[in-house]
C-alpha cells in the first residue's frame, strides 16, 4: 500500500548549499522531517549545478515522516538576468530597457527550461522565455 501524503513543501534552495538554517530548517522541522538527511541528499543531487543558483524543490512529506523531493530547473528570470549580465530587471519594463538577449541565448535557456515548461515544441518554449525577458525589461533580438 502506498504511503499517505501529509504535505507538499515548495522551497527555493541554492544549489549545493542546503543547510538547516531558514528557510529549509523551519519548513521541514514543523513537519517532523529529518532536516540533515534532506540537506545531504539535496546537496549531493545538485552538486553538478552552478553553486548558489536557486533551485526550486518540491518536497513530499509522508505520514511516517519520510520524504521524497523533486528538483526543478532554475527560474527563467534568474537565467535571463545571468545571460544579460544584469543584477535586477527594469522597474518599468515597457519603457526602460536594461539589457539585451539574443535568440541564441533564448534558445539555450528554453532548452534548459523545457522539462518544466508546458510548451509543445522548442519554438513555443522560446516564445515563452522571450515573454519573460520582455517583462524583465530586456530587449529580445530575433524573436
Curated annotation (Swiss-Prot):
<comment type="subunit">
    <text>Part of the ribosomal stalk of the 50S ribosomal subunit. Interacts with L10 and the large rRNA to form the base of the stalk. L10 forms an elongated spine to which L12 dimers bind in a sequential fashion forming a multimeric L10(L12)X complex.</text>
</comment>
<dbReference type="InterPro" id="IPR036796">
    <property type="entry name" value="Ribosomal_uL11_N_sf"/>
</dbReference>
<dbReference type="GO" id="GO:0006412">
    <property type="term" value="P:translation"/>
</dbReference>
<dbReference type="InterPro" id="IPR020783">
    <property type="entry name" value="Ribosomal_uL11_C"/>
</dbReference>
<protein>
    <recommendedName>
        <fullName>Large ribosomal subunit protein uL11</fullName>
    </recommendedName>
</protein>
<comment type="similarity">
    <text>Belongs to the universal ribosomal protein uL11 family.</text>
</comment>
<keyword id="KW-0689">Ribosomal protein</keyword>
<keyword id="KW-0694">RNA-binding</keyword>
<dbReference type="InterPro" id="IPR000911">
    <property type="entry name" value="Ribosomal_uL11"/>
</dbReference>
<dbReference type="GO" id="GO:0022625">
    <property type="term" value="C:cytosolic large ribosomal subunit"/>
</dbReference>
<dbReference type="InterPro" id="IPR020784">
    <property type="entry name" value="Ribosomal_uL11_N"/>
</dbReference>
<dbReference type="InterPro" id="IPR036769">
    <property type="entry name" value="Ribosomal_uL11_C_sf"/>
</dbReference>
<keyword id="KW-0488">Methylation</keyword>
<dbReference type="GO" id="GO:0070180">
    <property type="term" value="F:large ribosomal subunit rRNA binding"/>
</dbReference>
<comment type="function">
    <text>Forms part of the ribosomal stalk which helps the ribosome interact with GTP-bound translation factors.</text>
</comment>
<keyword id="KW-0687">Ribonucleoprotein</keyword>
<dbReference type="Pfam" id="PF00298">
    <property type="entry name" value="Ribosomal_L11"/>
</dbReference>
<keyword id="KW-0699">rRNA-binding</keyword>
<dbReference type="GO" id="GO:0003735">
    <property type="term" value="F:structural constituent of ribosome"/>
</dbReference>
<dbReference type="Pfam" id="PF03946">
    <property type="entry name" value="Ribosomal_L11_N"/>
</dbReference>
<dbReference type="InterPro" id="IPR006519">
    <property type="entry name" value="Ribosomal_uL11_bac-typ"/>
</dbReference>
Amino acid at each position: 500500500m502506498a504511503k499517505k501524503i501529509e504535505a507538499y513543501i515548495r522551497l527555493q534552495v541554492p544549489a549545493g548549499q542546503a543547510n538547516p538554517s531558514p528557510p529549509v530548517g523551519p519548513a521541514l522541522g514543523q513537519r517532523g522531517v529529518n532536516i540533515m538527511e534532506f540537506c545531504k541528499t539535496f546537496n549531493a543531487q545538485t552538486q553538478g549545478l552552478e553553486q548558489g543558483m536557486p533551485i526550486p524543490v518540491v518536497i513530499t512529506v509522508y505520514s511516517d515522516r519520510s520524504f521524497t523531493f523533486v528538483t526543478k530547473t532554475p527560474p527563467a528570470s534568474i537565467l535571463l538576468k545571468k545571460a544579460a549580465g544584469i543584477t535586477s530587471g527594469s522597474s518599468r519594463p515597457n519603457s526602460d530597457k536594461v539589457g539585451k538577449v539574443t535568440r541564441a541565448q533564448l534558445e539555450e535557456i528554453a532548452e534548459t527550461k523545457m522539462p518544466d515548461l508546458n510548451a509543445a515544441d522548442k519554438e513555443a518554449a522560446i516564445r515563452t522565455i522571450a515573454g519573460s525577458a520582455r517583462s524583465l525589461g530586456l530587449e529580445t533580438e530575433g524573436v
